[in-house]
């Protein structure tokens, strides 16, 4: 980020990492989103709802993911190691960081 041709956006693997990114950008004197846009991934509301500016993030279906995990275990697939796939809808939650 200290290079003259720095990135204009950072996509973080989760909202906690995005919070750390906010701090690193601030330490460098950069502003979100004026200098660098930041996007998180999971919509962990304790983080994404409490940042300034509010964090743009991708919503993970946490409840559904938990239900799928329980169904996988109870179905016996987990014991056999048989993989199961689920297609999840993960909407972009647009706030002010990007």
Stretches with model-predicted labels:
Residues 2-98:
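Flexible loop/turn connectors
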